[in-house]
Amino acid sequence: MSAIAPITGTIRKRILADITIGFAIGGAMASYWWWGFHKNIINKREAYYAKLAEQKAAEN
């Protein structure tokens, strides 16, 4: 018997944990960017162009 435990499955478990945590954090950050930042910018742009089209229609 050796005094040190074998490291056979530890690396595999650690790699799977790192990949899972990475995807979870990446998904959370991507969701925050999409719903918290990107959608607000797009809504402002769409409102601007709708207002511009309304003004153009009022001129004609």
From Swiss-Prot:
Membrane-topology descriptor: Single-pass membrane protein
Record GO terms (molecular function): cytochrome-c oxidase activity
Entry keyword set: Membrane, Mitochondrion, Mitochondrion inner membrane, Oxidoreductase, Transmembrane, Transmembrane helix
Mitochondrial matrix-facing ranges: 1-15
Transmembrane segments: 16-38
GO cellular component entries: mitochondrial inner membrane
Signal peptide limits: none
Gene Ontology biological process terms in this record: mitochondrial electron transport, cytochrome c to oxygen
Intracellular or extracellular location(s): Mitochondrion inner membrane
Topological domains annotated Mitochondrial intermembrane: 39-57
Pathway, per record: Energy metabolism; oxidative phosphorylation
Main location: mitochondrion
Propeptide cleavage-removed residue intervals: 58-60
Subunit structure: Component of the cytochrome c oxidase (complex IV, CIV), a multisubunit enzyme composed of a catalytic core of 3 subunits and several supernumerary subunits. The complex exists as a monomer or a dimer and forms supercomplexes (SCs) in the inner mitochondrial membrane with ubiquinol-cytochrome c oxidoreductase (cytochrome b-c1 complex, complex III, CIII).
Similarity field: Belongs to the fungal cytochrome c oxidase subunit 7a family.
Main function: Component of the cytochrome c oxidase, the last enzyme in the mitochondrial electron transport chain which drives oxidative phosphorylation. The respiratory chain contains 3 multisubunit complexes succinate dehydrogenase (complex II, CII), ubiquinol-cytochrome c oxidoreductase (cytochrome b-c1 complex, complex III, CIII) and cytochrome c oxidase (complex IV, CIV), that cooperate to transfer electrons derived from NADH and succinate to molecular oxygen, creating an electrochemical gradient over the inner membrane that drives transmembrane transport and the ATP synthase.
Protein name stated in the entry: Cytochrome c oxidase subunit 9, mitochondrial
Source organism (scientific name): Kluyveromyces lactis (strain ATCC 8585 / CBS 2359 / DSM 70799 / NBRC 1267 / NRRL Y-1140 / WM37)
Gene: COX9
